[in-house]
Amino acid sequence: ADGHRVLAGIDFAFAYPRHDRGAYFPGVAASPATAPALWALVEELCADAEDFYGGPFSRDRQRPFHAYLNAPGHRGHLFESRRRLTELQCRRITAPSPVFNCVGPASVGIGSLAGMRLLHALTEAANPAAAWPFAPPMAGLTVVEIFPRLYFKLVGADPRAWADPDNLAAAITGWDSAPPASARVASEDEADARIAAAAL
């Protein structure tokens, strides 16, 4: 909103692990050196796909990056269950999935690739957003990565019981937010949005 600072949380991985090997794609000459460069690369390789779809990045076997992905129809020979620092910190409470995984029920890779395209668009817009922690908060829009399952668990609530109004209400008030008039939700996404808003 004009004249207001807005903090928005989005539920996807903002980048791949880098701290463990010193690179997103070790040994690849074209490996991006920064998160914004990674977003630009994903956008370049997926530019023809609509609605920020990131599938082309995971399916192009001619690119060296493919060797690091567990992708539909092909498990790269360099794929490992690497974790970012933020995921290592979360392990004592919950178990985030590896961002390089693009298949199966625990897949977060495809959604994160779409998210990276979104981050590229937001940060390159005429009125750019700041994507923290890769850029400091600024006037206007700042976007941060969220992990709703963690927010439930940090206050002793069960994320699997998201449809239970009492469980959701307890989770929200656990973050010192006012009790909701109604904690009934129509979907898990709605429950995630409400607990994330309270946590932020």
What spans do the regions from the language model cover?
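RNase H-like (RuvC/DEDD) metal-dependent nuclease/polynucleotide-processing core
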Residues: A1-L200
